[in-house]
Amino acid sequence: DVCSSDLFKHILSQVVFKAKTEYDNMQVNIKDIKIFNVKMGGVYTLPATADGTGSWAVGDWPESSTGGGFITVVQGKFIEVNSNTTATDISEKTPMLNIPQKLTAWKVSEEATNTKIKADGAHQCYLSITCKIQQSGVYLLGSADSYGAIYVPFGDTWVAGKRHIYTLIFGGGYTDQGEA
């Protein structure tokens, strides 16, 4: 029997993305977004008592040539972002549920981690965004026929039972070599 005093405590973190542009004359068409260098598994220990708190033991880094796992936020969606005032929903209708963990942002300004490959080796987190960016009709990234990739440092602490909402503001980013 479940009574009204029983509370459900969610053990995962909910993550949602939205996007807008930095300038009103900018248009972005997003194809894919991935979060790199996140831990992909762990063990959750249930609380010993009904009013207790469980705990996570997050696993080791996945074995891969990229240094860590990645989470796909959107894939093949072709989301159009064309406002610098109203954020466009990317994943609110399909939020991600992830293992609570600390994400260390890619430190682009440091020599030891100034490229994407070095960031992977140090397990520093970033977003990989495949998109087209236009400003006043001129392509800044990609073309009418192709998409380009930008990388954005991404760090936070995902807390169990909490909803984390991120609004991406397109107007910058880095190449895989850490160049703005």
Locate each region found by the language model.
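Extracytoplasmic cysteine-anchoring/structural motifs
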Residues: 1-180
